[in-house]
Amino acid sequence: MPRSLKKGPFIEGKLEKRILDMNSREEKKVVKTWARSSMISPDFVGHTVAVHNGKTHVPVYISENMVGHKLGEFAPTRTYRGHAGGKAEKGGSAPKRK
């Protein structure tokens, strides 16, 4: 269920303050954050935010089409290493029927 319009989007105060300070000084630094639930606002465009995925910080460059999404959407928390090799990779499966 989406957030109420009455409340407005959630953006962590510390993160928003750091981005606005960098905009006023025209700086481009990587900003580390653990706030995966923060919504991306238009002020963030052009900055790189390092979002924590539970193990490391994943650098995410913010572009215009990311506005309105949450930071956590761009830093996956799970790694997929593929299914077990088994017989399928070795070619040991039964021949196809016609």
From Swiss-Prot:
Presence of keyword rRNA-binding: yes
User: Which UniProt keyword terms apply here?
Assistant: Ribonucleoprotein, Ribosomal protein, RNA-binding, rRNA-binding
Query: From the UniProt record, which GO molecular function terms apply?
Result: rRNA binding; structural constituent of ribosome
InterPro entries this protein is in?
A: Ribosomal_uS19, Ribosomal_uS19_bac-type, Ribosomal_uS19_CS, Ribosomal_uS19_SF
Q: Where is this region: Disordered?
A: 77-98
Q: Which GO terms describe its cellular component?
A: cytoplasm; small ribosomal subunit
In the record, biological process GO terms are: ribosomal small subunit assembly; translation
Entry's family note: Belongs to the universal ribosomal protein uS19 family.
Q: Which NCBIfam families match?
A: rpsS_bact
State the function annotated in the UniProt record: Protein S19 forms a complex with S13 that binds strongly to the 16S ribosomal RNA.
What name does the UniProt record give this protein?
A: Small ribosomal subunit protein uS19
> Which organism is this protein's natural source?
Prosthecochloris aestuarii (strain DSM 271 / SK 413)
